[in-house]
Design a protein with these regions (language model features):
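Crotonase-fold acyl-CoA enzyme core
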Residues: 104-188
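Conserved CoA-thioester-binding segment of acyl-CoA-metabolizing enzymes
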Residues: 1-66, 89, 100-103
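Hydrophobic/aromatic residues within transmembrane alpha-helices
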Residues: 26, 63, 75, 127-128, ...
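Phosphate-coordinating loops and pocket residues in cytosolic domains that bind phosphorylated ligands
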Residues: 36-39, 72, 81, 175, ...
Length: 188
């Protein structure tokens, strides 16, 4: 879990990557926070995607989340701390970096698969929507919870959702902000 940074401090690694027979499995490993996205996770995920996208032996990228959630969205504590510190530019930078990471997934020449075994909320759902395929289980639940408090999906989720599932399903997901079971989403 720890990555040696040479002369620098040790950093905790939240992204585990393995390659087997051309399939790169990229696991977001922050189960204590339900794999919530923060600055470090987004940065490390971007680095991991750069590495596997550049590896000619890789033909498929599988995204997974450790523990009970795929990704439970953005880390709310990050936003609260930044707002309290009047550091709104940090939130803007985080969002811009999130767009870059999702664009790396969406534009990858590799086949991309989100293995959504558990919750895929907010930014986690947006991450899944940036992949070519989303595979769920009976435990899988999708939701844009931010819409229930008047915040729109900030990483392109409303646009990707409409392209993949159609406008009626995207409207339901974005306007209602309700949980959708994985089985229900297969209808869209």
């Amino acid at each position: 879990f720890f990555v040696d940074q040479g002369d620098k401090n040790w950093n905790f690694s939240y992204i585990d990557t393995s390659i087997d027979q051309g399939i790169a499995t990229v696991t977001i490993n922050r189960p204590e926070a339900m794999n919530a996205l923060n600055e470090t996770v987004v940065s490390q995920l971007g680095d991991a995607l750069d590495l596997v996208n550049a590896d000619d032996s890789v033909h498929t990228i599988v995204l997974d989340g450790a523990g009970k959630a795929f990704v439970a969205g953005a880390d709310v504590k990050f936003f609260v701390d930044k707002i309290r510190a009047d550091a709104i530019p940090d939130i803007v930078e985080f969002t811009a970096n999130g767009h870059i990471v999702l664009d790396k997934l969406e534009s990858s020449s590799k086949t991309t698969v989100a293995l959504t075994t558990g919750l895929a909320l907010g930014g986690g759902l947006e991450l899944a929507l940036a992949c070519d395929y989303r595979i769920g289980t009976r435990r899988t639940q999708f939701r844009f919870p931010e819409t229930s408090i008047g915040i729109y999906p900030g990483l392109g989720g409303s646009q990707r959702h409409a392209r993949i599932c159609g406008l009626p399903a995207a409207r339901l997901a974005c306007f209602a902000g309700e949980f959708m079971a994985g089985s229900a989403t297969s209808d869209h």
